[in-house]
């Protein structure tokens, strides 16, 4: 933990004075210092934690006061404060707090105490059936506060992150809610999932309610909480059939929200498969019996990677005998109360709840997400909305709508729900009476509420307000049969590129009383088990909400006779193809005989799939669906051919809907409308191979574009399997029409060539212009009187090297002035010789000496060929020259070796030529030794690499002799340069013999020449040892000489010296001139 000046507290632990100075500063510090204002007293000045909760969060103690929940006792000396050191080094169990609000342990205690206080207040309120939430609305944190209200033991085991408090803003909720304010009390929170993220939430649309909604799970990894505090100052009235809910729910409505990626809002409340419906119709006036709203748990399942955050608000204790669960479904939300919220709808509770138009649902707003989900509202203006679960249940034909309760919400759109006339589902004031056939369709005015925009990944926008996957099938009530049909609980689709973990979309069918049917859910969804068939005129014949998972999708269906609910992660499809949401379709039914049944063949098993799935690009229902159109039949979009499922639904009465889903054959069902009195629902199934016919809403151009895109996709990823039939071959080959075209002609090629040439020419011109500009800049910089900074640096470096080389030359001139002058003159003569050889003056004289040099050169070329070097003499120079440079560097200065190094620097072209000339001139003086000079290093290199040809002592003596011979030859170079008039001729002859690429020689011949040269070197090495300078140089050069070490020295030491000498090229000339002038 570092403070502003990067001084670490751990460094100050052992020194109380330094720590006091670090904490409080010098005595003359200003009175407005952060730590001085923090209220440190003299008694506890030695304690870091004294009044740490009052300290400014931006002070240097913020890490200590935030990360440490409790400090040691006052007056604890810092020199022995080991607890501080341990707490400093350990990771804090509490979450990292922001600087907006420092940690306050009192606040945390109050938050924990508020749970009990809230429970007591709510019980008192429920008993008195009136009251205000003012008494516990004060127990809220600042919306942006991130102080932890969670015990460390609850959260630290998961991901180290803890829940953040939920900000609350008080919003008036209308005239009936004027006297009530809503506060979300921070209940006792505990983790259920793994690695729960910490996010802020705020309740933007406030509601009143007499119960709690426990929200388990997360919307896009955000924890959230809902409370219903006051219901219009009254209670929810239970008006049931005298049957109680089964007791396996344990007293709470469990609204199961499966949100694969936190976007879909399809809630499954699952209590019991065979429960009786409990309708709770209330307008704001008629209340009959006081019914305590029990703990409503809204559980939202999450994506495989997301986390679950349950927020448990303890409700009033529930009597085990009288357990009623309530399905809080789509509740009417006024526009000014909704702020990008989510109205929670449950889809599969065994008991339908009837909620009045004025009840609002608390909207959980996601502050920290950029993609708030749009709130969906269901409201009825004149009557009550009966939201039935898809389970098979008896129902008395009330004048009520059956509204599907699944809402698919786009995560990218932020639209406010319109007012009542523009709400998503709006019913006419005239309700359906018992003898009426759906004269008012639920999906009225679907376009007026600008709900959702289509996202690209969402392949099946159902309604014109794309992604308003409020796939509503208006369930109509039937007078004659008295068995109402419930709505299609279409599954919400994920939008925004999320991977659809499909929700259950139990599509419920209108059935006659005596007939049984199975509604096939979307494949890949996991839902609750359902009643398969229920007989009796007052029951739903069969409503199967168990949307079974297709086996190939790897999903599973959780089924069980006792309504098991999803609490864990939902299942994911392996094949990751976003299955579109089910299409909104209107099911026309006659009042007296509604006998359209879709019976699933027993062979399909768990592969049930209702035809209401759609994967069309767009099903634009731009015009609001008016009420009389409900009898037109169901408008069905194309079915995705994702699953091979055959649904030969057969009707016991008059209709057959056969949907044959091929693996790649989407279909479109067209429903022929029928009058209310006729039971005709006819579905024509058009199966057209890969090409699916367009829906009614598709224009011709859109369909052509769609077909082209499909053909292009098939062309890019062709099916390489065998043709099954002629039609299959035609279908698969016709898609290649998008690739039509002709081969490029000569004209096309010429045009491309011209374009390329134009571009290349322009590029070259621009490059040349840039180079010219750079040269001009360099020239201008050179002509400046005041040089630029770059030139100044270059000059400094140059001058530094010049001074170093000049001092070295001065030392050399002082030690051996004659040798220095001789080297200087030698370098000039060598330069002249190099130029003469370049002009091609050659002669045949000295062919004997050149031939004596040639076999070693060939052997060297042979050896160099292995390393990729083709110029043997040139490569030999890099070993010969550094030998002499090393000798001079160790103090045994031979003027000839320095002359050699300078010759290399003077002329790069004459590098090979100079060495060969120097050796040749030495050979004029000592013919035998000169012929052995060049092969010397090569001979020792060969023998050292082939240690089996001789003993180590013999090799060492040979190598020593070779080096002696080289130094000797160099000592004679000066005189040979002056005395030999034919040096140039000899040099050119040597270049003629060895500089040209040598043909391949036989290995035996090269080995013989190598051994001959070694023997000659041994003989010749004994002669020059009488020279004292040479012998001294040998002793200094090779004190402990071994064959391998000598080669390493040649390779490692000599080449760096040689490169160092090349850098000093220009400075040596100047130094030589200066030395001559000094002499």
From Swiss-Prot:
Low complexity bias (residue ranges): 68-79, 590-604
Compositionally biased tracts (Basic and acidic residues): 918-928, 938-952
Name of the protein described by the UniProt record: BRD4-interacting chromatin-remodeling complex-associated protein-like
UniProt keywords, alphabetically: Phosphoprotein
Domain of life according to the entry: Eukaryota
Protein species of origin: Homo sapiens
Lineage of the species this protein comes from: Eukaryota, Metazoa, Chordata, Craniata, Vertebrata
Gene name in the database record: BICRAL
Keyword Phosphoprotein among record annotations: yes
UniProt KW Phosphoprotein keyword: yes
């Amino acid at each position: 933990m570092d403070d502003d000046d990067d001084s670490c507290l751990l460094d100050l632990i052992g020194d109380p004075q330094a720590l006091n100075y670090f904490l409080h500063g010098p005595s003359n510090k200003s009175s407005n210092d952060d730590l001085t204002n923090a209220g440190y007293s003299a008694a506890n000045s030695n304690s870091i934690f004294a009044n740490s909760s009052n300290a400014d969060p931006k002070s240097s103690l913020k890490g200590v006061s935030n990360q440490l929940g409790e400090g040691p006792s006052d007056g604890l000396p810092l020199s022995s404060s080991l607890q501080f050191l341990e707490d400093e080094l350990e990771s804090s169990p509490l979450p990292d707090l922001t600087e907006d609000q420092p940690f306050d342990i009192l606040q945390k205690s109050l938050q924990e105490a508020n749970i009990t206080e809230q429970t007591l207040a709510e019980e008192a309120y429920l008993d008195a059936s009136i009251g205000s939430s003012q008494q516990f609305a004060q127990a809220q944190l600042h919306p942006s506060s991130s102080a932890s209200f969670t015990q460390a033991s609850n959260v630290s085991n998961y991901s180290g992150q803890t829940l953040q408090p939920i900000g609350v803003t008080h919003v008036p909720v209308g005239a009936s809610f004027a006297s009530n304010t809503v506060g979300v009390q921070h209940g006792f929170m505990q983790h259920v999932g793994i690695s729960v993220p910490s996010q802020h939430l705020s309740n933007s649309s406030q509601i009143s309610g007499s119960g709690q909604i426990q929200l388990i799970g997360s919307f896009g990894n955000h924890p959230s909480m809902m409370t219903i505090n006051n219901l219009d100052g009254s209670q929810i009235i239970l008006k049931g059939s005298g049957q109680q809910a089964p007791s396996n729910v344990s007293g709470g409505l469990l609204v199961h929200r499966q949100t694969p990626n936190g976007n879909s809002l399809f809630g499954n409340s699952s209590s019991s498969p065979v429960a009786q419906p409990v309708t709770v119709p209330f307008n704001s006036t008629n209340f009959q019996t006081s019914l305590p709203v029990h703990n409503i748990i809204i559980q939202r399942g999450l994506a495989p990677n997301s986390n679950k955050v349950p927020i448990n608000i303890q409700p009033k204790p529930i009597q085990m005998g009288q357990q009623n669960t309530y399905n809080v479904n789509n509740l009417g939300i006024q526009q000014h109360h909704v702020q990008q919220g989510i109205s929670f709808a449950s889809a599969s509770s065994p008991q339908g709840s009837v909620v009045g138009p004025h009840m609002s649902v608390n909207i959980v707003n996601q502050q920290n997400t950029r993609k708030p989900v749009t709130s969906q509202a269901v409201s009825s203006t004149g009557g009550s909305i009966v939201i039935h679960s898809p389970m098979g249940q008896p129902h008395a034909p009330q004048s009520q709508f059956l509204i599907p309760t699944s809402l698919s919400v786009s995560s990218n759109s932020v639209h406010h729900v319109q007012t009542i006339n523009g709400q998503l589902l709006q019913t006419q004031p005239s309700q359906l009476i018992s003898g009426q056939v759906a004269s008012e369709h639920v999906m009225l005015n679907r376009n007026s509420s600008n709900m959702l925009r289509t996202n690209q990944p969402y392949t099946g926008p159902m309604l014109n307000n794309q992604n308003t996957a409020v796939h509503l099938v208006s369930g109509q009530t039937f007078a004659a049969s008295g068995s109402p049909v419930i709505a299609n609980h279409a599954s919400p689709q994920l939008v925004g590129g999320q991977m659809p973990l499909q929700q259950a979309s139990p599509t419920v069918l209108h059935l006659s009383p005596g007939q049984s049917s199975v509604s096939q859910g979307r494949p890949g969804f996991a839902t609750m088990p359902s009643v398969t068939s229920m007989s009796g005129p007052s029951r739903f014949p069969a409503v199967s909400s168990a949307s079974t998972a297709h086996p190939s999708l790897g999903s599973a269906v959780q089924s069980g006779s006792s309504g098991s609910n999803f609490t864990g992660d939902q299942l994911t499809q392996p094949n990751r193809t976003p299955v579109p949401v089910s299409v909104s379709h209107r099911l026309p039914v006659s009042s007296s005989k509604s006998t359209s049944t879709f019976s699933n063949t027993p062979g399909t098993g768990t592969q049930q799939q209702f035809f209401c799935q759609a994967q069309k690009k767009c099903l634009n229902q731009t015009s609001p669906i008016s009420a009389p159109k409900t009898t037109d039949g169901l408008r069905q979009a194309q079915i995705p051919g994702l699953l091979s499922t055959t649904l030969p639904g057969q009707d016991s009465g008059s209709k057959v809907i056969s949907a044959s889903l091929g693996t790649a054959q989407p279909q479109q069902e067209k429903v022929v409308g029928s009058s209310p009195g006729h039971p005709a629902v006819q579905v024509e199934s058009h199966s057209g191979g890969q090409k699916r016919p367009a829906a009614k809403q598709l224009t011709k151009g859109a369909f052509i574009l769609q077909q082209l895109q499909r053909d292009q996709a098939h062309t890019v990823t062709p099916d390489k399997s065998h043709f099954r039939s002629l039609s299959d071959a035609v279908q698969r080959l016709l898609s290649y029409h998008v690739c039509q075209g002709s081969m490029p002609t000569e004209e096309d090629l010429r045009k491309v060539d011209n374009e390329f040439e134009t571009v290349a020419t322009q590029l070259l011109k621009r490059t040349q212009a840039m180079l010219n500009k750079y040269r001009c800049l360099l020239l201008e910089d050179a002509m400046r009187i005041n040089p630029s900074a770059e030139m100044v640096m270059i000059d400094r470096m140059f001058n530094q090297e010049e001074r170093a080389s000049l001092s070295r030359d001065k030392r050399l001139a002082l030690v051996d002035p004659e040798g220095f002058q001789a080297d200087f003159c030698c370098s000039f003569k060598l330069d002249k010789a190099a130029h003469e050889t370049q002009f091609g003056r050659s002669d045949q004289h000295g062919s004997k000496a050149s031939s004596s040099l040639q076999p070693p050169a060939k052997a060297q070329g042979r050896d160099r060929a292995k390393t990729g070097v083709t110029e043997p003499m040139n490569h030999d120079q890099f070993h010969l020259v550094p030998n002499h440079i090393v000798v001079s560097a160790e103090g045994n200065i031979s003027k000839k070796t320095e002359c050699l190094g300078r010759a290399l620097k003077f002329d790069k072209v004459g590098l090979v030529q100079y060495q060969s000339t120097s050796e040749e001139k030495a050979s004029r003086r000592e013919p035998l030794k000169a012929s052995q000079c060049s092969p010397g290093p090569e001979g020792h290199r060969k023998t050292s690499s082939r240690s089996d040809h001789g003993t180590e002592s013999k090799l060492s003596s040979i190598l020593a002799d070779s080096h002696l011979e080289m130094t000797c030859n160099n000592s004679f170079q000066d005189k040979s340069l002056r005395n030999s008039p034919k040096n140039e001729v000899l040099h050119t002859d040597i270049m003629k013999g060895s500089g040209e690429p040598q043909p391949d020689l036989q290995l035996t011949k090269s080995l013989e020449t190598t051994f001959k040269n070694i023997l000659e070197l041994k003989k010749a090495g004994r002669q020059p040892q009488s020279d004292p300078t040479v012998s001294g140089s040998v002793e200094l050069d090779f004190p402990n000489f071994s064959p391998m070490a000598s080669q390493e020295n040649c390779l490692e030491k000599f080449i760096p010296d040689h490169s160092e000498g090349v850098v000093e090229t220009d400075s040596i000339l100047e130094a030589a001139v200066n030395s001559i002038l000094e002499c």
